[in-house]
């Protein structure tokens, strides 16, 4: 029985729940098993995609597991001062307190594209694409063009928030 759940994220293969005491619960098929999250503690934020599950702790460190193997997402163990996460199918982005974006996973194009992004205040990801909002209200994009739907992006100014969702395709809205 799940009790004291403060956040629930349903997914294609799993459901993640963040409890008031900072623990995380998981249920679902998980390619044969749910995520192994029983050891996750002091969690303040959870995120998932069809490829992975992740969480930010109160100290700004990250837990992250691949869906198909329950193995850690390599590279995230050294992340510090993380304030937000954005998972894609085969990558995970973290936003640091000083506005940098860190990345781990298997999508070399995205990992390379975001490494120099600075002054970022929000990140969002879907499948194989990423958007980031800068402190100046500009939006940066990268990823598979099939998943990027942006018309007139060069005219976007003073954007205040990014919203991402998936419903058969991928969309970012500013």
Spans of model-derived segments:
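Aromatic/pi-system hotspot detector in well-structured domains
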Residues: 2, 15, 40, 52-57, ...
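N-terminal non-cleavable signal-anchor helices
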Residues: 6-7, 25, 38, 44, ...
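Residue-level hotspots at or immediately adjacent to binding/recognition sites across diverse folds
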Residues: 10, 61, 81, 87-90, ...
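Repeated scaffold domains used in trafficking and secretory/extracellular systems
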Residues: 5-6, 43-50, 81-84, 120-122, ...
